[in-house]
């Protein structure tokens, strides 16, 4: 096994033997003379026998499984640690170890690494996607690392001592604003030509994208209304025990979205019948298997006697018929044999002809006599002509039969809800969607391409899904696309599996009446917000109302307020409470007063489910999962996953649980309910919003050049004029398209600027000095439950090398921003895989094992008085 402990420790031993080979040969010879049991003499035969017991002393917490090998009484000779050990390359570490090692270099398989500070190398390595680290993407230009914003303390060092505190704070705020503004402008210039960026912010592309999204939304709405009119939602409940019916409904929606008809929906019934037939067939086989051995011996004997009698009667009848059948069979066999003999003769003639043709090219072939060859060729030509005539007649007969079968084929329902798809993990940001479509269109059955949003932490690489018809051989297409490059980027597609669990459940507490009523309120609010945002039930601004088949108001929200108002019998409770009820201070004798039974209201649940299905089918929003599935119309599954209510909880629930569920659920829905955020006018001006008129004036001024007295040039056309006003007039008249381009560019930048959630590079914070709270026992950091993990993000540019004071996992390290949750940092020697955090340290504290990360087994020997008080400075 490649990942077993023995194999893994063997490779680690081999690694350190290679490191010592440059200066330890004399010591090895001495040890061999002393008769030490050294396994190096048997490189091939001794590999498997080399055990992890040789480093047993470095891991005292391990259990002994076998007797350790013999060693001499004297301690092993220690060697000096070389200065270059920290940066040594490890032949057994692949590029996969780098994100977890946290320190110096294993070999990288991507572009050649530049000379310079080791932290720059680490940062560049972590920024690359995995394909670049493995060599799939050639020659990626990493560019200059982004600048880091100064901390207030660093900023104060650049100021004069005469600047007071308030002025320093003001200047620092201005510095931060300028820094962010500059970063935003640099980001815009770096990505303005990329397709994903233009489709999001360029005025022309934004309009096209909105029209496409609106058309897809209208199509999904028509599908929902069609299914509702057909009664698909009448008896459908979003409970986990109705999973089969829910999947069938989702498939029906997908068939309708793909342009299917009512006839195509019949395939769902056929699939259901086939499944039931398969189940009944299996059940009948099991019953027969059980019933077979259950027959008694008496029954078997009786059956045997009856069979013998019947056989005796049949024997007489059969004897008279045997002669007739034998004759007929004999005649039939003779005819079949004749036909087979004729076919074989024809085949043999053809083979002989082919062989003779092939042999005629050989120098040593002996030709037959001319008369024989001519006669044979004439016969062969006749046979070929007859065969050709027969072949011509066959297609005509087939064509006559085709129209009869065509009517039956047209009626056959199509499985439009099933597709095949390929998944592409890394698509470079400079690759356009049209390029992928043109590449995949060459293969039959191509349907569509879906691209995910770019990921800033992965250099804005995107994931892609290419959908094909179900009838294609998807593995063959995947193989053909395997080694194709687009703009020096390997697509490396893989076959995308079908969804396994399309219906998933959440907590069954959602069946409670109080929660259902609250969900109706939230779902109605969500529908109202999404409909307004997409203007689904209103005509687009600036266009006359076009008569459509869609109603003017959402029929789903009709009379919804009837279910939002809770009816209470307050008067009755007041009268009963004041007259005969027990005082509220007195607790009941039995049961917990805070616990209640789960109360299910079928009427409310039916209303809620219709709202949730509207959200799922029309707006691609999974309510119980509190998430929106973006670009679902372009994905392989147009209606893939849905979350539903789980089974009813077996125990009583507390009132606090109900309130806590409602509170957390509303918090999760808040981002979906919020209107798209955009910067205010004041904030936009601070960030550098551009005025179109001013930018046009700048453009005209820059293209008005004075050559001399009364001599002005327009560089756009090369024409000369007597004055600047003539140049201006010329630009507006003859170069109006350039003016429009400037205005569009301004709108492009302003759209990006005003987006509060605009993409940006991951923020890299400066290294923080270690505080007293960071000095903890080895392996433990506040709020970090996983002491074995090391930073998976990138190291900041210019960060100093980690200090050497801590050999173990307790070394105090500067903070490394990763853009995610903080992780404890790698100890000294982490260039060899951060091994000390896994094995050494004498079992102090708990040491989780991880076989994927290999490292240094030579833990530092620690001397500690067990009776002394705790001291964190020991080695």
Curated annotation (Swiss-Prot):
MF terms (GO), sorted A to Z: DNA binding; mRNA cap binding complex binding; protein-macromolecule adaptor activity
Inducers of expression: Upon cell proliferation.
Residues recorded with modification Phosphotyrosine: 8
InterPro entries: RBD_domain_sf, SE/Ars2, SERRATE/Ars2_C, SERRATE/Ars2_N
Biased composition (Acidic residues): 369-386
Positions where Phosphothreonine occurs in the chain: 543, 670
Entry keywords, A to Z: Acetylation, Activator, Cytoplasm, Isopeptide bond, Methylation, Nucleus, Phosphoprotein, RNA-mediated gene silencing, Transcription, Transcription regulation, Ubl conjugation
Principal cellular location given in the protein's record: nucleus
Record's compositionally biased regions (Basic and acidic residues): 8-73, 297-345, 387-411
Covalent crosslink: Glycyl lysine isopeptide (Lys-Gly) (interchain with G-Cter in SUMO2): 150
GO BP annotations listed: neuronal stem cell population maintenance; positive regulation of neurogenesis; primary miRNA processing; regulation of DNA-templated transcription
Subcellular location: Nucleus, Nucleoplasm; Cytoplasm
Disruption phenotype: Death around the time of implantation. Deletion in adults leads to proliferative arrest and bone marrow hypoplasia whereas parenchymal organs composed of nonproliferating cells are unaffected.
Modified residues (N-acetylglycine): 2
Positions where Omega-N-methylarginine occurs in the chain: 832, 839, 849
Tissue expression remark: Widely expressed, with a preference for proliferating cells. Highly expressed in hematopoietic tissues and reduced or absent expression in parenchymal organs like liver and kidney. In the brain, expressed in the subventricular zone by niche astrocytes, ependymal cells and neural stem cells. In this cerebral context, expressed in slowly dividing cells.
Chain residue ranges for the region called Disordered: 1-90, 272-411, 571-597, 834-853
Entry-annotated residues carrying Phosphoserine: 4, 67, 74, 136, 492, 539, 569, 678
GO terms for cellular component: cytoplasm; nucleoplasm; ribonucleoprotein complex
Assembly and binders: Interacts with CASP8AP2 and ERBB4. Interacts with NCBP1/CBP80 and DROSHA. Interacts with LUZP4. Interacts with NCBP2/CBP20 and NCBP3. Interacts with MTREX.
Physiological role: Acts as a mediator between the cap-binding complex (CBC) and the primary microRNAs (miRNAs) processing machinery during cell proliferation. Contributes to the stability and delivery of capped primary miRNA transcripts to the primary miRNA processing complex containing DGCR8 and DROSHA, thereby playing a role in RNA-mediated gene silencing (RNAi) by miRNAs. Binds capped RNAs (m7GpppG-capped RNA); however interaction is probably mediated via its interaction with NCBP1/CBP80 component of the CBC complex. Involved in cell cycle progression at S phase.
Family statement drawn from the similarity comment of this UniProt entry: Belongs to the ARS2 family.
Protein name (Swiss-Prot/TrEMBL): Serrate RNA effector molecule homolog
Record organism: Mus musculus
Gene encoding the protein: Srrt
């Amino acid at each position: 096994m490649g990942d077993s402990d023995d194999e893994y420790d063997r490779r680690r031993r081999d690694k350190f033997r290679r490191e010592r080979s440059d200066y330890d040969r004399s010591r090895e010879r001495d040890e061999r003379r002393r008769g030490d049991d050294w396994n190096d003499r048997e490189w091939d035969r001794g590999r498997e026998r080399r055990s992890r017991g040789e480093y047993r002393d470095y891991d005292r917490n391990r259990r002994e499984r076998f007797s350790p090998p013999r060693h001499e009484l004297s301690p092993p000779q220690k060697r000096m640690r070389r200065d270059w050990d920290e940066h040594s390359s490890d032949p057994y570490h692949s590029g996969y170890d780098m994100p977890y090692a946290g320190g110096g270099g294993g070999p990288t398989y991507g572009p050649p690494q530049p000379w310079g500070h080791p932290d720059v190398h680490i940062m560049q390595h972590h920024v690359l996607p995995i394909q670049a680290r493995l060599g799939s993407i050639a020659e990626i230009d990493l560019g200059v690392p982004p600048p880091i914003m100064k901390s207030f303390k660093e900023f104060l060092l650049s100021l004069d001592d005469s600047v007071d505190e308030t002025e320093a704070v003001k200047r620092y705020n201005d510095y931060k604003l300028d820094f962010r503004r500059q970063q935003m402008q640099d980001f815009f210039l770096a990505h303005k030509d990329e397709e994903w960026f233009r489709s999001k912010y360029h005025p022309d592309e934004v309009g096209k994208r909105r029209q496409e999204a609106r058309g897809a939304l209208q199509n999904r709405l028509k599908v929902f209304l069609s299914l509702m009119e057909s009664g698909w939602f009448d008896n459908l409940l979003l409970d986990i025990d109705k999973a089969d019916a829910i999947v069938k409904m989702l498939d029906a929606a997908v068939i309708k979205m793909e342009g299917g008809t009512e006839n195509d929906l019949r395939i769902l019934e056929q699939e259901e019948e086939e499944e039931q037939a398969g189940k009944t067939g299996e059940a009948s086989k099991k019953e027969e298997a059980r019933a077979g051995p259950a027959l008694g011996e008496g029954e078997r004997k009786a059956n045997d006697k009856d069979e013998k009698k019947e056989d005796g009667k049949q024997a007489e009848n059969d004897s008279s018929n045997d002669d007739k059948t034998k004759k007929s069979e004999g005649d039939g066999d003779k005819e079949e044999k004749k036909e087979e003999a004729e076919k074989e003769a024809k085949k043999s003639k053809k083979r002989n002809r082919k062989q003779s043709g092939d042999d005629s090219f050989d120098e040593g072939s002996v030709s037959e006599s001319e008369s024989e060859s001519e006669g044979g060729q004439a016969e062969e030509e006749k046979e070929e002509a007859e065969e050709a005539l027969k072949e011509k007649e066959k297609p005509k007969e087939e064509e006559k039969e085709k129209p009869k079968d065509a009517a039956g084929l047209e009626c056959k329902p199509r499985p439009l809800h099933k597709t095949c798809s390929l998944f592409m993990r890394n698509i470079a940001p400079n690759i356009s969607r049209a390029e992928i479509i043109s590449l995949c269109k060459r293969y039959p059955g191509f349907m569509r391409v879906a691209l995910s949003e770019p990921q800033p932490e992965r250099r804005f690489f995107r994931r892609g899904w290419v959908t094909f018809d179900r009838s294609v051989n998807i593995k063959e297409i995947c193989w053909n696309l395997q080694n194709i490059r687009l703009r020096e980027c390997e697509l490396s597609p893989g076959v995308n599996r079908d969804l396994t669990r399309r219906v998933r459940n959440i907590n069954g507490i959602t069946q409670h009446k109080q929660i259902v009523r609250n969900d109706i309120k939230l779902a109605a609010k969500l529908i109202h917000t999404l409909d307004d945002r997409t203007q689904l039930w209103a005509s687009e601004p600036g266009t006359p109302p076009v008569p459509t088949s869609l109603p003017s108001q959402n029929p789903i929200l009709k009379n919804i307020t009837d279910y939002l108002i809770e009816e209470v019998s307050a008067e009755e409770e007041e009268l009963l409470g004041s007259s005969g009820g027990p005082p509220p201070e007195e607790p009941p004798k039995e049961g917990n007063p805070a616990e209640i039974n789960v109360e299910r209201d079928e009427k409310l649940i039916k209303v809620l489910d219709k709202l949730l299905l509207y959200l799922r089918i029309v707006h691609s929003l999974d309510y119980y999962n509190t998430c929106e599935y973006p670009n679902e119309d372009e994905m392989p599954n147009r209606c893939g996953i849905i979350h539903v209510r789980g089974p009813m909880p077996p125990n009583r629930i507390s009132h606090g649980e109900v309130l806590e569920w409602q509170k957390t659920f509303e918090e999760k829905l808040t981002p979906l309910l919020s209107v798209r955020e955009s910067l205010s006018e004041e904030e936009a001006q601070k960030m550098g919003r551009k005025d179109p008129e001013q930018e046009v004036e700048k453009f005209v001024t820059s293209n008005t050049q004075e050559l001399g007295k009364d001599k002005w040039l327009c560089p756009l056309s090369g024409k000369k004029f007597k004055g600047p006003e003539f140049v201006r007039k010329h630009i507006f008249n003859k170069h109006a398209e350039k003016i429009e381009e400037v205005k569009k560019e301004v709108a492009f930048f302003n759209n990006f600027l005003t987006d509060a959630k605009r993409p940006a590079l991951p923020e890299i914070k400066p290294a923080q000095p270690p505080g007293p709270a960071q000095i903890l026992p080895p392996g433990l950091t506040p709020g970090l439950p996983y002491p074995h993990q090391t930073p998976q993000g990138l190291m900041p540019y210019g960060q100093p090398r980690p200090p050497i004071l801590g050999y173990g996992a307790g070394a105090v390290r500067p903070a490394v921003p990763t853009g995610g949750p903080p992780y404890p940092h790698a100890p000294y020697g982490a260039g060899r895989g951060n091994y000390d955090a896994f094995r050494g340290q004498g079992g102090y504290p708990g040491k989780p094992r991880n076989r994927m990360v290999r490292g240094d087994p030579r833990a530092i020997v620690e001397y500690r008085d067990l009776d002394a008080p705790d001291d964190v400075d020991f080695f």
